[in-house]
């Protein structure tokens, strides 16, 4: 990925729900991760829907909240594209937009962040988040 890494997390996929099968398969998925964002520890929870595309890839749209250990919140909305990889795992890449009143996390209000999100066959998740404005500022 390009840009400065500003966050990462590890956790578990939660509930999965089939929303439709025609004309495309559409599923809703929730997850929860122990995460850091701009060096601040917390919990990241989110829900996304994934729809199959004609080539077998996935289009995902989601939203969630990062809660710091001292009670501050950052909401996020994202969209991305996913691919099935080996052994039943899924790999997504996409973009996030954040909103917060937290002073220490206020930088998030003005950036578009790029993410990588992986879910293995057992439901374990891993995420990495990058500040794309860092790259643009140095281009």
Question: Where are the regions a protein language model picked out?
Answer:
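Beta-strand-enriched cores of mature, soluble protein domains
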Residues: 1-139
